[in-house]
């Protein structure tokens, strides 16, 4: 008996059904890697960011996420280089899909049990996606922005429904706009923290600050 097509589980029905001590025997999801490329590059290295956003409320299978990751990664490595981008999968397949196996071949009518015990057994996993939720994100340099958009366009064919490619106005994966990030970085009010950045607010101990100034000046070391 082959794998049931994912179109049978596309619509979101009922409550989430995650893996737990009551829901055992769940197959491992097909996607195991969620960060691809130069994931250790600092926040200042890749200012450009583009997202693949879902425009429907639906279930996305783990097989589709893995296929999209492979397609996007393959094009970016071929066109921009393996050291020129950071791809991140933004959704995780935590919802468990069930199947009530029914033998439909000839001569199998004596083996079927109909609707007796029809709750079903675990078949696979999927991600429950809302409208406007980000599926994939790519950060890179400005020179490779068109390659990132083309990579997400190719990955879009692996998903059901409608998706949109949106160029972010933020700096990389941070929450700061590009103009604000540059300004705050010059004022030393932002500290790089891996792929993200920490904002230094007015709160906290004042032991290391000069009297009369809440922040250190840009020229101070």
Swiss-Prot record:
Family (UniProt): Belongs to the universal ribosomal protein uL16 family.
Subunit structure: Component of the small ribosomal subunit. Mature ribosomes consist of a small (40S) and a large (60S) subunit. The 40S subunit contains about 33 different proteins and 1 molecule of RNA (18S). The 60S subunit contains about 49 different proteins and 3 molecules of RNA (25S, 5.8S and 5S).
InterPro entries per record: Ribosomal_uL16 (IPR047873), Ribosomal_uL16_CS_euk_arc (IPR018255), Ribosomal_uL16_dom (IPR016180), Ribosomal_uL16_euk_arch (IPR001197), Ribosomal_uL16_sf (IPR036920)
Protein name from the UniProt record: Large ribosomal subunit protein uL16y
GO BP terms: developmental process; response to UV-B; translation
GO terms for MF: structural constituent of ribosome
Domain of life (superkingdom): Eukaryota
Highest classification ranks of the organism: Eukaryota, Viridiplantae, Streptophyta, Embryophyta, Tracheophyta
Key words of the record: Ribonucleoprotein, Ribosomal protein
Gene Ontology cellular-component annotations: chloroplast envelope; cytoplasm; nucleus; ribonucleoprotein complex; ribosome
Record's keyword annotation contains Cytoplasm: no
Record's keyword annotation contains Ribosomal protein: yes
A Pfam family per the record: Ribosomal_L16
């Amino acid at each position: 008996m082959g794998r049931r097509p994912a179109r049978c589980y596309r619509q979101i029905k009922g409550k989430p059904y995650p893996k737990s001590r009551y829901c055992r025997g769940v197959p491992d999801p097909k996607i195991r890697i969620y960060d691809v490329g130069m994931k250790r590059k600092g926040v200042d290295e890749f200012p450009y960011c583009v997202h693949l956003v879902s425009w429907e409320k639906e279930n996305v299978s783990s097989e589709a996420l893995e296929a999209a990751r492979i397609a996007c990664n393959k094009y970016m490595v071929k066109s921009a280089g393996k050291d020129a981008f950071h791809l991140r999968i933004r959704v995780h397949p935590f919802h468990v899909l069930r199947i009530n196996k029914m033998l439909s071949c000839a001569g199998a009518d004596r083996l079927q049990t109909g609707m007796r015990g029809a709750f079903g057994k675990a078949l696979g996993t999927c991600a429950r996606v809302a409208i406007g939720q980000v599926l994939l994100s790519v950060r890179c340099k400005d020179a490779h922005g068109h390659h990132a958009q083309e990579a997400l366009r190719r990955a879009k064919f692996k998903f059901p429904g409608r998706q949109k490619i949106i160029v972010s106005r933020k700096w990389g994966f941070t929450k700061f706009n590009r103009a604000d990030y540059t300004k705050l970085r010059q004022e030393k009010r932002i500290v790089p923290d891996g792929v993200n950045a920490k904002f230094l607010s007015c709160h906290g101990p004042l032991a290391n600050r000069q009297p009369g100034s809440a922040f250190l000046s840009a020229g101070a070391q």
